[in-house]
Amino acid sequence: MEEINKYIQNSSETGGEIYNLIEELFPICRSITGNGVRKTMDIIRKHIPLEIHEVKSGTKVFDWTVPKEWNIKDAYVRNSKGEKVIDFKENNLHVMSYSVPVHKTMTLDELKPYLHTIPGNKDRIPYLTSYYKENWGFSLTQNKFDELCDDDYEVVIDSSLEDGSLTYGEYYIRGELEEEILLTTYTCHPSMCNDNLSGVALITFIAKALSKLKTKYSYRFLFAPETIGSITWLSRNEDKLKNIKMGLVATCVGDAGIKNYKRTKFGDAEIDKIVEKVLMHCGSEYYVADFFPWGSDERQFSSPGINLPVGSLMRSCYGFDGYHTSADNLCYMNKDGLADSYKTYLEVIYTIENNRTYLNLNPKCEPQLGKRGIYRMIGGGSDYPFDEFAMFWVLNMSDGKNSLLDIAYKSGMEFRRIKYAADALYRVELLKLV
Amino acid sequence: MEEINKYIQNSSETGGEIYNLIEELFPICRSITGNGVRKTMDIIRKHIPLEIHEVKSGTKVFDWTVPKEWNIKDAYVRNSKGEKVIDFKENNLHVMSYSVPVHKTMTLDELKPYLHTIPGNKDRIPYLTSYYKENWGFSLTQNKFDELCDDDYEVVIDSSLEDGSLTYGEYYIRGELEEEILLTTYTCHPSMCNDNLSGVALITFIAKALSKLKTKYSYRFLFAPETIGSITWLSRNEDKLKNIKMGLVATCVGDAGIKNYKRTKFGDAEIDKIVEKVLMHCGSEYYVADFFPWGSDERQFSSPGINLPVGSLMRSCYGFDGYHTSADNLCYMNKDGLADSYKTYLEVIYTIENNRTYLNLNPKCEPQLGKRGIYRMIGGGSDYPFDEFAMFWVLNMSDGKNSLLDIAYKSGMEFRRIKYAADALYRVELLKLV
Amino acid sequence: MEEINKYIQNSSETGGEIYNLIEELFPICRSITGNGVRKTMDIIRKHIPLEIHEVKSGTKVFDWTVPKEWNIKDAYVRNSKGEKVIDFKENNLHVMSYSVPVHKTMTLDELKPYLHTIPGNKDRIPYLTSYYKENWGFSLTQNKFDELCDDDYEVVIDSSLEDGSLTYGEYYIRGELEEEILLTTYTCHPSMCNDNLSGVALITFIAKALSKLKTKYSYRFLFAPETIGSITWLSRNEDKLKNIKMGLVATCVGDAGIKNYKRTKFGDAEIDKIVEKVLMHCGSEYYVADFFPWGSDERQFSSPGINLPVGSLMRSCYGFDGYHTSADNLCYMNKDGLADSYKTYLEVIYTIENNRTYLNLNPKCEPQLGKRGIYRMIGGGSDYPFDEFAMFWVLNMSDGKNSLLDIAYKSGMEFRRIKYAADALYRVELLKLV
């Protein structure tokens, strides 16, 4: 898996490509079902051969039921002068997701209970949903709301809520082993970038890179609506769960903030140790949070009956300034941040792929490295052509139980440094793979 | 056990009642045996139906022997002018506890070896005892000592040290379970308040409150002389120890200082976790100390052959300024401190009673809380009518092994918050009691 | 083992004697083999009856082979005026250890690749070796190097590298038990003091002291060349390893720096806890480092196929300013540092010898210490003739599993204080040895 380094080295360039994909997906009005999701999948399929699944409305998925499919053509509020004072075509956040069809004339007072704003941030449109209770509503900025005067308003939501299906995409890469790594992201949010077109685009490019590499583990990429999508996938794939070794949920990975890792519920699972080791040596600031049982789809993967070690590697965590509003737009995206997220995910995968456990074949005292050509020849000086410190750690700890990651932790050294030392020792047959 | 909240809410008022009981008990001259203890028990019995036990002098109790009973009518030192320069009737600390009878005339020089003062605190009378070696003595302030002139002094201790018995009181409340909680305090100190009329009075009122409630656990309240009393009780009740789930020793609970918890010898027993969780959220400063094998009766409960998880929840720990002197008087008592100690003990009992373990009956992914009416209906906003964060913690961790207390610790939330969330989930049949 | 205290009390005087031995050994040119080592052993044998072992060149020792024996009579570089510009007789560091014989005339340019200096410390001669590759070289100060002018130089190394043997010394003291404590030091360094004549001389005097005492454990002292010496010993004594309970490598123990303990690979072995407890109460500053798999012979003892709990108790760790140069000379030695190292090693041995585990024979409640004459007779005061606090800790924790060291840790008390309390309790038959 040294070939992945090529992708890591090109991450800066890839940051731009990820941004371009976000830009292409931005205008589409997505929800947990509907044609917006299908359009999104079509675009992703230009990069990776996503397999599309459609699950019928009414299907029972654990405690939940797949809802009706929602589609929307247009929506507006028009005043008596014929001016659209709220217009879905300007910003699809203006309509509460899953709004039922409406066509009536209402006074301002009648309309007000259906209008939602953020009084404390007067220029942002809030993002609202009502998936499981029939309802309708408009979101708008407080500024626009304040300009509305008494009038008779024509209120139109040209939507449909009918039996249909829930759409999700899946891409599976078979590696040398059946054991698999699960990388998921969610596709249900309309025109917002960090949450979560950034995750969608990042996972697309990670999958694209891995599709060109020979991997030890198998990889599964899941693009599904949040909550109901992961629940649907889990309820249909219980037989596959035994193969999942670890996973990550990708969300909020495109902004300029520092990297932010939310641990699995176990707190010290292999994926936790891997991500934290990568972050420790990443050279920039980061934050690690313990698991909490809300947030994104790690909630479902971590429920006591599923219990998978799934963490979430983000930049600014959900709840950032502008979260779930029109402020989470293309301006909030940062190409360097996207590139760094891409690089970090690849470093994590590099570590997953290379975390082997060896047995020292010369366990009694140190082997004589010099006669094998991997040790300095003049003692006492300070000229160290070989990384003997890392080699000594690997030799000392390779009792068949400690992995290279364990050795990296104990020594305080970067995983790669330990890995390269192990490679050198393996080449001269001082190590055996366990 | 939500009814206990009524007592918690009224703790401020109860603080005053506890103070009144201390005031009533203050003048009595107690020791490890004798009529002062019996008088004390009679007064406590006005509040709770204490069962009184008398254990004969000479009875073997483990390595110890119940000593002779000591009683005292009067004691003084009178100068040649007929003035009582030391008078037991002024303060019963003037006489060393267990002083044998004396009636002789002595010069000052002869008397001096029997006079005890605190040179560094000239206005305090020290509290001294000589239970296990026949001896006699007077305590007085250094100031008074300094005024004594050469003279012939009449020295009188009108005491008796004879076969009799050791008196202790016990009150047992049978709960739903045979498993019991032990709350002990000691009754052997003469006129000193924080050590330990505060403990005696507090436990009286805790027992009074619990006597009116239906409890899950049984409760045993022990009022006995320190050391010899708890040893006596333990030696006579070895068969009961298997039922004791945990316990607390109440002492020094009446002053204005911060709360102070001395852990059990185990350091992380359930009672430790409960008391510390209550303290964490008490809103005021507190201190937690690891176990040390001196102090009060937790020494006996923690001996290697008894090994019970018994901690001690105090305010200013023994050794406070004025400890074991006449300065530990009614002025040292603080009604707010007493009220807060009462409230804290009740909060601990609330937590003991409600610390259940549940099993999530819908373990695969999250259950749909909305369809059960315990979840907000519009997503994305910030209006949270239900405590979904606490509910998510309970659902995520209720695998039949984690108790509500464990969940409270992991989540960082107050125990009550977790408990109420579990109640809500239990009502809609998402949880089963383990 | 209270008799060891006499040696501890005299440590200041012994510091001077250790210094004198260093001074006597300093001029000798040692290497990993050769007559310098033999001469060193002869001098040590004036203090302790060291058994000398000779292992033939060519002997296989695990992955290594005992090298040819190296001896040197003289070496110099002489300019055309007949002046010795580099002279082995002035300082034996001038010749790279294991230099093959040389006799030729060379220009400065031809000679330069064989000259080694420390450019950043112009007045120090570096210490260099080439044990396993035939090579030769001279070390000199940068200052001297800078003075060399173009000339024809006569280059002479009058050495021999021939089949012979590797010499090591061993001294074994049989104690009451077969279980043994291993104390090792290395003898291969030429004229340098802290590294490692300080270790050689210290271990000599520790062995000298123990030879006069009756010990519980057996003690083995090893004086061997670093790396190849300990490997040789280990390969010839595999059957003895099962008896080794713990060990220490003595090196760099003679300077004025603070004490420095490098933990065993286990990190919490008994020797780690003992040394750290001694250091905690030593009254001066110290440092504790986790194990790392380079340094001295603890590397070999800690290899995965040997796995012995061997730490290293030093003062300034290798790598100190002047390390492996001519600056590590007699001026770098400090008699107080030597005395303190000696004292500390003896305190460690005192703790090893006395770390017993007892069973409290009166486990139910506290025993009545007063009736056994080991408790104050008047309660309440502050006169504590007996160390009841330490006795309470011993009684409380002596359940047959906790050692005195465990009790010392839990109580925060010095090991001696706990040991003396246990002695008092043992005398009155309250404890039984486990």
UniProtKB/Swiss-Prot annotation, chains A, B, C:
Entry cofactors: Zn(2+)
SUPFAM superfamilies: Zn-dependent exopeptidases
Region named Permutated winged helix-turn-helix: 356-434
InterPro entries per the UniProt record, alphabetical: DUF2172, DUF4910, UCP015244, UCP01524_HTH, WH-like_DNA-bd_sf
Keywords: Carbohydrate metabolism, Metal-binding, Zinc
UniProt keyword Zinc present: yes
Name listed for the protein in its UniProt record: Putative polysaccharide biosynthesis protein with aminopeptidase-like domain
Lineage: Bacteria, Bacillati, Bacillota, Clostridia, Eubacteriales
